[in-house]
Amino acid sequence: PLPQSYSLTVTTGVELPQDLLLTDYDRTLGLLAVLDGPSAVPAPGGMQNADDVFSWIGDNQAKGISNIPAITFHANPTWSSTHWDDSLEDGLALITQAAQKYLGDAQIVASEYKKWRFATPRKVWPDPFFAAGTLVFAGDAFAGPKVEGAVLSGIKSAEYVGDLVGNN
């Protein structure tokens, strides 16, 4: 995430555009749950904005990511912000309760609750990366606020660096 990357530039003298420095991110609370059977998430195994709690629900087994029944839940920014300061126990209980209707007859046999501070950039930079000479910033704040955007940004920044190296 950009806010964590800025610390690398503090002693370099590299000046970054103000708009880039002001990039902010929504927080996301997440739950990864291992189940004792199949979930109730419909094919093809993913749901966006399923309800007033979750912005993403993914059945990892249905998507071919896991050999065992496992499901990932990402709470939306509003719900995540509201519950960010809840204790780990309370946060886990609330998100698990909200997830129940997507489990079907399955029970959670193991779970992990996550707080993702820099989850989704609120504003996307207009270019696929930012370069200050040989220092390149890339990621989801440049080419789109999902993993696909981060990958595309990384590819474009790698091409840029390749051109720099190839020209020397």
Please tell me what each predicted stretch does.
Residues 26, 32-84, 90-103:
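Active-site substrate-recognition segment that forms the wall
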Residues 106-108, 162-168:
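Active-site-proximal substrate-binding core of FAD-dependent oxidoreductases
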Residues 93-133:
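Flavin (FAD/FMN) cofactor-binding core of flavoprotein oxidoreductases
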Residues 71, 126-158:
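Short FAD-binding loop at a beta-strand-to-alpha-helix junction that anchors the flavin cofactor
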Residues 78-80, 116-121, 143-144:
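Short Gly/Pro-enriched loop/turn and capping motifs at secondary-structure junctions
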Residues 92, 96, 151-162:
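Short, amphipathic alpha-helical "lid/cap" segments that border enzyme active or binding sites
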